[in-house]
Amino acid sequence: MVRTKKTDSFFESYRMEAAPRKGDGFTQKDFALRNASWLISDIMTDRHAKKGRREGFQAPISNDTPVSDEKVVYKKSEDASLEIKKVSKFFGADLCGITGLDKRWLYSKRVDVRDMSEVDLGLPDGLTHVIVLGHQMDKDLVQTYPSALGGAATGREYSHEASIVMQIAAYIRNLGYQAVASMNDTGLVIPMAVQAGLGEYARNQLVITPEFG
């Protein structure tokens, strides 16, 4: 994405005070729902902003739990994959795929949001696989874009995702393995999702899944 005044205005609209007006999808209640839907995502994103980390969007999410000194050993990698998929569904993910880490899709740098400078991505050693999740948005609300209600559909799933990826990463670290929670911040998720078997690459440069399109 190229940063412009229009892109800045778009993202700022999610952080400014609501400006209700007449019309379906733009009332005070509609903006209240949108802002509440983004709350958990915003809390996670802002918690280390003073350190230059806008986590989940421009930096990987910081670990909240250490890697256990005692490692759970699996007889087969398939057993570990099946377990992670079950745990992902338990935490609330609609789709879960796993693939090997392809470093072609990782960003070479991240941005320090204090001065917009480039800094190291800061991923730990020992990462070998990528867990890719899918979340179903409310179709009826999505179809109301560009209303505040459309933003509520997006915000709800970003907040869900923030919680889910942190929980999965914590689970894996408690098993004795390194894991980093990530959203839109670490690499190109579209090719990762395709490699993880969640769907096919579409002409609109997104992933089309059998379940949700």
Task: Label every model-predicted segment.
Residues M1-T99, K103, Y107, V113, ...:
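Iron-sulfur (Fe-S) cluster-binding modules
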